[in-house]
């Protein structure tokens, strides 16, 4: 067509040439508009197909039967035995995954993407913790045990296969608050080059039936995906207390969550790249089922630091600070009998604030002694409040 316009343009007057140019531009504009309308038509056709297609039924795979059929639990209620559509890769069909059934509920038409619970997503996940054993004072024996039962199986599982024994599946750390249980777990994750997943057990306690158990299940699935990994369950007594026969619906839900945790502990290989560490300061109320062989096999006490331990902890914190030369670590350790590692850290921080308030850039021995007295007053108040609560509870 453009050739015809060229012939007309050569044999025509200037006005006619201008008209031809306008017509050419109009044709180009119309061609673009036709293409846009074609795209819009295809879009609406696709939308109409979606609207007219029958809805699918969501279901969860329970088991794959020997004859190739699948047992599923449908969202509408009953368990069904269904077939797999020919276009579905049968290797993708595994227990626990979500699938879409046709409206009659007889065939799996689609494998749905796996969803991760928002609570699991928000758990503290540290790809590579930066805590080392050298930052922990007074816990040499506890570090040795953790290295043997957590770090060694993660780094050298073949040693256990050769000798024919299985390492412990889980480790339980117990002791007063602030004694370094979380730091121990982070340090062993650092040395093992493992992802550290920190969860407080109370996060498992949900108000809807089955929610807590599902979160536990998804937590272990995430840990397997991120392996090598260490799951650290803090305050496990929140869901692991001794079970009672009669309780509220909330207590029954916590018991279901505990049962799911026990099932997960029973269900994984101790030589896998996932290790479980739990911590509590109330080991006396834990359910015996948690402590039986095959679950939390190794129980490690993390006590308040002794004189030597307190000296080491003071040295760890003070060597990072600007201090005067006359600091007497032994005297500081004597003055802090009964202090936890967290208390000693608070002493060092409080002493630094005293120096800052006075406009000094170094911490003195007097600052540290005053800080010890201040922390002692706070500790005594907390103890007094605790005693009153126990008296009137």
Curated annotation (Swiss-Prot):
Listed A to Z, the keywords are: ATP-binding, Chaperone, Coiled coil, Cytoplasm, Nucleotide-binding, Proteasome
Cellular component annotations (GO), alphabetically ordered? cytoplasm; proteasome regulatory particle, base subcomplex; proteasome-activating nucleotidase complex
Query: What GO biological process term is on the record, naming one?
Result: protein unfolding
Q: Cellular location of this protein?
A: Cytoplasm
- Give positions of region: Docks into pockets in the proteasome alpha-ring to cause gate opening: 391-393
Could you tell me the superkingdom of the organism this chain comes from? Archaea
What InterPro entries does the database record attribute to this sequence? Answer: 26S_Proteasome_ATPase (IPR050221), AAA+_ATPase (IPR003593), AAA_lid_3 (IPR041569), ATPase_AAA_core (IPR003959), ATPase_AAA_CS (IPR003960), NA-bd_OB-fold (IPR012340), Nucleotidase_PAN (IPR023501), P-loop_NTPase (IPR027417)
A single GO molecular function term of this UniProt record: ATP hydrolysis activity
Q: Does Cytoplasm show up as a keyword for this record?
A: yes
* Coiled-coil residues: 15-53, 365-393
Query: What are the TM regions of this chain, as residue ranges?
Result: none
Q: Which Pfam families match?
A: AAA, AAA_lid_3, Prot_ATP_ID_OB_C
SMART domains per the UniProt record, alphabetical: AAA
So where does ATP get bound?
178-183, 317
Entry comment, domain topic: Consists of three main regions, an N-terminal coiled-coil domain that may assist in substrate recognition, an interdomain involved in PAN hexamerization, and a C-terminal ATPase domain of the AAA type.
According to its UniProt entry, the function of this protein is described as: ATPase which is responsible for recognizing, binding, unfolding and translocation of substrate proteins into the archaeal 20S proteasome core particle. Is essential for opening the gate of the 20S proteasome via an interaction with its C-terminus, thereby allowing substrate entry and access to the site of proteolysis. Thus, the C-termini of the proteasomal ATPase function like a 'key in a lock' to induce gate opening and therefore regulate proteolysis.
NCBIfam families referenced in this protein's UniProt entry, alphabetically: PRK03992.1, proteasome-activating nucleotidase
Which HAMAP family does this entry report, sorted A to Z? PAN
How does the annotation summarize its subunit structure?
Homohexamer. The hexameric complex has a two-ring architecture resembling a top hat that caps the 20S proteasome core at one or both ends. Upon ATP-binding, the C-terminus of PAN interacts with the alpha-rings of the proteasome core by binding to the intersubunit pockets.
PANTHER family membership: 26S PROTEASOME REGULATORY SUBUNIT
Name the protein family.
Answer: Belongs to the AAA ATPase family.
- How is this protein named in the record? Proteasome-activating nucleotidase
- Protein encoded by which gene: pan
């Amino acid at each position: 067509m453009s050739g015809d316009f060229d012939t007309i343009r050569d044999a025509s007057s200037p006005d006619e040439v201008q008209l031809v140019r306008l017509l050419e531009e109009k044709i180009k504009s119309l061609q673009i508009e036709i293409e846009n309308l074609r795209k819009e038509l295809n879009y609406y056709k696709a939308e109409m197909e979606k609207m007219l297609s029958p809805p699918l039924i969501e279901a969860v795979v329970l088991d794959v039967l020997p004859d190739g059929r699948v047992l599923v639990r449908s969202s509408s209620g009953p368990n069904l035995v269904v077939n797999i559509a020919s276009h579905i890769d049968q290797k993708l069909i595994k227990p626990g995954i979500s699938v879409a059934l046709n409206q009659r509920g007889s065939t799996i038409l689609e494998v749905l993407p796996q969803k991760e619970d928002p609570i699991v997503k928000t758990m503290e996940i540290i790809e590579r913790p930066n805590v080392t054993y050298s930052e922990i004072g007074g816990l040499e024996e506890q570090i040795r045990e953790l290295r043997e039962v957590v770090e060694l199986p993660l780094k050298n599982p073949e040693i256990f296969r050769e000798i024919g024994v299985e390492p412990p599946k889980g480790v339980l750390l117990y002791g007063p608050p602030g004694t370094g249980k979380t730091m121990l777990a982070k340090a062993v994750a650092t040395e093992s080059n493992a992802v550290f997943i920190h969860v407080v057990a109370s996060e498992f306690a949900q108000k809807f039936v089955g929610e807590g158990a599902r979160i536990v299940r998804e937590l272990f699935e995430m840990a397997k995906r991120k392996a090598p990994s260490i799951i650290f369950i803090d305050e496990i007594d929140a869901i692991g207390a001794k079970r009672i026969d009669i309780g509220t619906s909330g207590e029954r839900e916590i018991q279901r969550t505990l049962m799911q945790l026990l099932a997960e502990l029973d269900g994984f290989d101790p030589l896998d790249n996932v290790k479980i560490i739990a911590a509590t300061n109330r080991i006396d109320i834990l359910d015996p089922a948690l402590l039986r062989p095959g679950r939390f096999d190794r129980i490690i006490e993390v006590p308040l630091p002794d004189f030597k331990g307190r000296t080491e902890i003071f040295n760890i914190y003070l060597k990072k600070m600007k201090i005067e030369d006359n600091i007497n670590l032994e005297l500081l350790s004597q003055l802090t009998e009964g202090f936890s590692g967290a208390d000693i850290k608070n002493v060092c921080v409080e002493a630094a604030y005293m120096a800052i308030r006075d406009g000094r850039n170094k911490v003195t021995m007097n600052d540290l002694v005053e800080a010890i007295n201040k922390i002692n007053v706070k500790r005594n108040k907390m103890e007094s409040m605790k005693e009153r609560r126990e008296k009137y509870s």
